[in-house]
Amino acid sequence: MARYLGPKLKLSRREGTDLFLKSGVRAIESKCKIDNAPGVHGARKPRLSDYGLQLREKQKVRRMYGVLEKQFRNYYKESARLQGNTGENLLQLLEGRLDNVVYRMGFGATRAESRQLVSHKAVLVNGKVVNIPSFNVKASDVIAIREKAKKQSRIGAALEIAGQREVPTWVSVDATKMEGVFTRQPERSDLSAEINEQLIIELYSK
């Protein structure tokens, strides 16, 4: 399955929530009618079946993290093998992706931009170049921008945007040095309450 290259706001409208696919300079509500899916007019929304709700939740989270279907299913399988709550394991695996950690630290304005920084070898993990967006970051790993990439205007712009929002408690960032530490795995209470991971588990458990 190819990666989606169409309008980002259309995906957020489809899922009925902000997927944080844009930089966040303006509230998404000011850019489009987030409550109305593309092609749906008026206040009435079609009623979804249980399967429909499960599918929509899976699509929402998959698109939020920018993960393809096969990758997402593999994350579910791995989360089911791990000890503990499968849903929480799934979210922790997604949060531990290098492209997501780069985004959480504010080096990329979006996850897509952060993924591009990783792919273009602009990111160091513990002093070594890693260009695999899905690389699994561990607690205490140091993430930094390469010296020759620090002058990129988009990174400076992303840090300015990040300065307007609260830094997640599971990362520490030195914006001046353009480096940070993934201090710990996020707990479920740290993450968005708008995600209902149980619906995803029910979908894949069938």
UniProtKB/Swiss-Prot annotation:
Signal peptide: none annotated. Keywords: Ribonucleoprotein, Ribosomal protein, RNA-binding, rRNA-binding. This is Small ribosomal subunit protein uS4A. PROSITE patterns: RIBOSOMAL_S4, S4. Belongs to the universal ribosomal protein uS4 family. One of the primary rRNA binding proteins, it binds directly to 16S rRNA where it nucleates assembly of the body of the 30S subunit. It comes from Psychromonas ingrahamii (strain DSM 17664 / CCUG 51855 / 37). The keyword NADP does not apply. Residues 96-156 form the S4 RNA-binding domain. One of its GO terms (cellular component) is small ribosomal subunit. NCBIfam families: PRK05327.1, rpsD_bact. The gene is rpsD1. It comes from the Bacteria. The keyword Phosphoprotein does not apply. Part of the 30S ribosomal subunit. Contacts protein S5. The interaction surface between S4 and S5 is involved in control of translational fidelity. One of its GO terms (molecular function) is structural constituent of ribosome. Disulfide bonds: none annotated. GO terms for biological process: ribosomal small subunit biogenesis; translation. HAMAP family: Ribosomal_uS4_B.
